[in-house]
Amino acid sequence: MMANASGTGQAFNILIVGQSGRLQYEAVLFAASLRHSDPGFAGRLFVAEPQPGPLWRHDPRITDPAVRTLLTDLGAEILPFDSRAFGETYPYGNKIEALSALPEGEPFVFFDTDTLITGPLSQVPFDFAKPSASLRREGTWPSIELYGPGYGAIWKSLYDRFGLDYPTSLDLGHPDEYWQRYLYFNAGWFFYRCPRQFGARFLSYATEILSNPPEALVCQTLDPWLDQVALPLVIHSLGGGRQTLPPGLLDGSVSCHYRTMPLLYARESDAVVAVLETVAAQNAVKRVLKDHEPFKKMIYQPKGVAVRALFDRANLPRREQVIRNTIKREGLWVR
């Protein structure tokens, strides 16, 4: 049985990726925070697990048996999938390829695994016919060269490649050649009414961009930005766009894409830290998370308090890199 989304009458599944290394521990924290913050969520939480194959040099599956057991105890379903296009050379592609393993025709919400659920997700009024994604981002792509094409030429070349209407994607509230004028998301969350339709288009667009980029992309790097280059094209092609959700819910009161523990302690609200520390204090969760050194240091030692003391949340540096560099100078950066 899946949860009903308030305001839509539709049910939905949740997808995150879990594999060896830090993502397996982040998956535990995600699942535990979902259970804590939305105990009424009756849906299915899928933890997609890439399987060994020719695109992986090492076994990518979850290595810690305690993680696997706890995820199941928290109500998650571990969902194997095969890597046919990306694998180890582009692990961000897991979010693209995992979509094909979800139940067809059932609405889904994808979250990056380094996300904390902080409120009742089941009450978010998703309109699954109008896909969208996170606007908590910086202008990371494209990188404009002095004598190269500008934002408009680069993005238009991509819309033209896939036969999409470019002008309707623009936010005319921003000036020409300013990055926010162009449809650009953080791929930390996105949603749609059918994962397989979304995933097939995402895979098609991403692989085409990678193997046969338009000439305007000649100066651009696609690693690690490929998913965020293809995502706005997919969303626009499926009738979605910016802010098809009420503001302040995802990336607000209901979810926090923390990225790393030092960044969470540096910039997130007291409410987010309270959810983190309440969830992490549960004995079953604590026993598992302490095996991941960054969580052990930040949450339990607790170095996160020292990171938090470095910053004024009411006056944070505008650029994330400045925050990262400050933490690194103090010897407190871990991931």
Label each PLM-derived region with a short phrase.
Residues P91-A98, G148-G152, T260-L264:
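Short, surface-exposed amphipathic charged segments that create phosphate/polyanion-binding patches used
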Residues I117-S157:
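Conserved donor-nucleotide/metal-binding helix-loop-beta segment in metal-dependent transferases, i.e.
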Residues M2-Q19, D171-G188, R193-R335:
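A glycosyltransferase accessory/donor-loop signature
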Residues M1-A85, E104, L222, K297-R335:
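N-terminal anchoring/stem segment of glycosyltransferases
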Residues W56-L71, L146-H174:
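Charged, glycine/proline-rich intrinsically disordered loops and linkers
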Residues F46-A48, V109-D112, I117, A133-L135, ...:
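A structural signal for short, well-ordered beta-strand segments and their strand-loop junctions
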Residues F81-F111, L116-G119, Q123, A133-R136:
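A conserved donor-nucleotide-binding helix/loop in the catalytic core
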Residues Q24-V28, Y92-I96, A187, P224-V229:
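Conserved glycosyltransferase catalytic-site signature
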